C-alpha cells in the first residue's frame, strides 16, 4: 500500500515534516494536497530535502493573492455573474516558480490537477530544460469549460476552476 504524507506540519507551509522518518515509516511521497505552499524559500528547502531523499513532492498550484472568489474562473462567466473569480495567473505563477525550483534543486515534482494551458506549456518547457516535473489533469478539466457554471451552478465550482479552453490541458 502506498500513501503520501504532508510536506508541512498542519498544512501551514511553515515547518517541514520529518520526510526522512516518514519515508522510513512507509510514505511514498509528500503533498499538502489542496493547500498551496506560498513561501518560495520553504518550497525550495522542501525540494532540496526531497531530492536528497529521492522522493516526490506533489503540489496544488493556486496563488491565493490573485484570487478574489475561488471556484470559478475569472472570465466571461464570472463577469456575467458579477464575480471576480480565479484567474489562470494564480496557477501559472506557482507552476512557473515550482518548475524552476525543481530544475535548480533536482527534485521530482508533480503538479496536481492542472487547469491552464499556459501551465501545461511551462511544464513542457521545464521538462525540455531538464526538470523532472510532470502534471495531471482531471477529467472535468479536459471535458468541461467555465460555461458549465451557468448550466450546473455551484456543482461546477471547483479548485482550480474550469477554464475557457479545455483542449489546452490535453
Regions found by a protein language model. Give the residues of each.
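Active-site beta->alpha loop and helix N-cap motifs at the rims of alpha/beta catalytic domains
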Residues: 8-12
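Histidine/acidic residue-rich metal-binding segments in metalloenzymes
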Residues: 14-170
